[in-house]
Amino acid sequence: LTTRRQRQMCIRDRINTEQPHSFFIPYDKAGDSLTQTLNGTWDFKLYKIDDDIPKEFYKKSYDKSDWDKIPVPSNWQFHTEDFPVYTNIIYPYEINPPFMPSDYNPVALYKRNFNLNKDWENMEVFIHFGAVNSAFYVWVNEKFVGYSEGSKTPAEFNLTDFLTDGNNEIVLKVIRWSDGTYLEDQDFWRLSGIERDVFLYAQPKLAVRDYFLKN
């Protein structure tokens, strides 16, 4: 599912994501949350179309010397030559679902490194994306983790089996317009990127994953 044609021929809107659940922050004890922010400065490279992206961009050895830097969270239209689009009922591209424009549909690569909290040994480690617009793929340490679309909803992945002691590398491939964009034709600015908080959190193997109130 990492190419434009593969996405268009598939009806899945997520791969390996956690089930949606009520949002809460786990704590080991008062004042000691089991979280680690990944907000901040990421390595960044923007391409005009998916087909322009090199095949091995997710490898640790990939040369990033010509990449830029971008703050996360943010929208890349405020940091690049790509442009924001404002419209209401008019789509900003030719209507041909589930297909998207082949001549201009920017795709961005994001990379950063982080050290895993040593106190999280023998715990399950998840990553939380508050919102990524409009669809994205995730790799950790050169291994494919998953895919999600839905530009204003959180997405979470279990990273436990992908992480190593010490330094880890995470890579995102973010697509400006996806087939899910057809369902988001409201009156608002069309912007792209990792636009809400990103953080890791840890939980014991036996833990509360969701809760609800019944009246």
State the predicted function of each range.
Residues 90-98:
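Surface-exposed acidic, glycine/proline-enriched linker/cap segments
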Residues 1-11:
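Single conserved hydrophobic/aromatic residue that forms the stacking wall/gate
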Residues 29-46, 69:
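Mature N-terminal segment immediately following signal peptide/propeptide cleavage
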